[in-house]
């Protein structure tokens, strides 16, 4: 899913894309300026380990336009948030959680693995760094499906504000809840027309039929 999303979005030839993974598994096509970074386990003497936190810092020194982190599992989550907050719009990462809301809690936990930081500060970082959360899960028939998409719109009452865009209904069908609040970046990256067509499709499909 991450490979497909990145290959479809990162088509601008003037952008430098850096991927960070345990091992190079992402299949990215049509990206000319692509740099792959991989983690390295310690040797027999327990030395020369290169973890994801170090790779994110190395990636920032390489002046990327976008950073793709295969999966965030621990304290490197703070480094990823910092990267997203320093002019690297369009960066992508993945993590394990049961919903978009649970992913926010998961990020809080991961950040606190490495630093004693006020929760309010962590939430502020997330609110400014992350635009959208996409939740993939298992459907009733066992297949993997898109379950939920939510937009982060800032802070409200000391919490990260989630704005639901799409959700899976009881009939196992993805339905539109609302439109994006902030559409500026869609226009900046030439995705606004495609977004409008998508909205027209869902509005027409979900419109009640009079009998």
List the predicted regions and their residue ranges:
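A structure-centric signal for secondary-structure junctions around beta-strands
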Residues: 6, 14, 143-146
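Short, low-complexity Ser/Thr-rich regulatory SLiMs
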Residues: 136-140
């Amino acid at each position: 899913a991450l490979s497909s999303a990145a290959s479809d979005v990162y088509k601008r030839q003037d952008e430098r894309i850096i991927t960070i993974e345990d091992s190079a598994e992402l299949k990215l096509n049509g990206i000319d300026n692509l740099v792959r970074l991989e983690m390295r386990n310690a040797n027999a003497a327990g030395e020369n380990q290169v973890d994801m936190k170090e790779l994110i810092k190395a990636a920032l020194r390489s002046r990327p336009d976008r950073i793709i982190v295969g999966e965030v599992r621990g304290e490197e989550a703070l480094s990823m948030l910092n990267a997203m907050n320093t002019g690297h719009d369009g960066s992508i990462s993945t993590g394990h959680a049961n919903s978009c809301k649970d992913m926010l809690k998961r990020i809080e936990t991961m950040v606190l693995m490495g630093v004693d930081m006020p929760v309010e500060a962590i939430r502020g970082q997330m609110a400014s760094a992350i635009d959208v959360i996409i939740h993939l899960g298992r459907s009733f028939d066992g297949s993997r499906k898109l379950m939920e998409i939510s937009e982060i719109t800032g802070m409200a009452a000391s919490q990260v504000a989630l704005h639901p865009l799409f959700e899976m209904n009881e009939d196992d069908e993805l339905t539109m809840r609302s439109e994006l609040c902030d559409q500026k970046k869609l226009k900046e990256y030439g995705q606004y027309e495609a977004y409008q067509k998508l909205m027209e499709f869902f509005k027409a499909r979900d419109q009640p039929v009079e009998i």
